[in-house]
């Protein structure tokens, strides 16, 4: 059964401006350690925009957004062997998911030159 749905779209140019202004402080705020290992220089802003939109979409599916103790670094977007995105939760995000009985988080991510979008469906396995 669907417990929550979230979506988010991010302008890659806005992320580039944040990178220019804040540099590593911005990446440290948004990314988990595992995600930072996947950083690449040539498409850094696009990668960050995808991660940012995915994390926002997950937080919306949890019904909190980025508040109530849920932070960007509580949501990790990794990849399965197949290349499909995989969501890992820690801290308050994990607690909120457990409170809602969420067992699976399905995520779809896409991007074009100027925009990144993510769509999330959180289910309880029923």
Model-predicted segments: where are they?
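Core catalytic alpha/beta fold that binds nucleotide/phospho-ligands
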Residues: 1-126
